[in-house]
A protein has these predicted regions:
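Short beta-strand->loop micro-motif that forms the acidic, two-metal-ion catalytic signature
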Residues: 44-47
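Glycine-rich beta-strand-to-loop/alpha-helix junction loops that act as flexible
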Residues: 29-31
Length: 105
């Protein structure tokens, strides 16, 4: 993966962690994690959030997207609860299967 992209992902995750105490972990997944990205690919980042529930999901998503847009418009945040990440949901399975954990500060 391009070092510039790696740096942008790290800046984004550090910004989220700094502003949101509820971030448990983060994973790069999708085409960038599989090293199959194209010029038009987005940068999928799963953000595991403590206590995320369906009532808050939209508001959290918007907040994460606004922060991502300040760093790189290709960053596509995907908030997910710890319980959902450990479920058999195909989305969660994809994150666990191909995801690369991004270290938090």
């Amino acid at each position: 993966m391009d070092k510039g992209i790696s740096k942008k992902i790290k800046i984004y995750i550090d910004s989220v962690a700094k502003n949101q105490q509820w971030l448990i972990s983060a994973y790069l997944f999708g085409s960038y994690a599989r090293n199959q990205q194209r010029a038009e690919s987005d940068i999928d980042v799963a953000l595991v959030i403590d206590g995320l529930n369906d009532n808050d999901r939209f508001e959290v998503q918007v907040s994460l997207m606004l922060l991502a847009s300040k760093i790189d418009n290709r960053i596509e945040p995907h908030p997910i609860s710890k319980d959902d990440l450990n479920s058999s949901n195909p989305f969660a399975v994809e994150i666990r299967r191909t995801g690369i954990e991004i270290k938090l500060k």
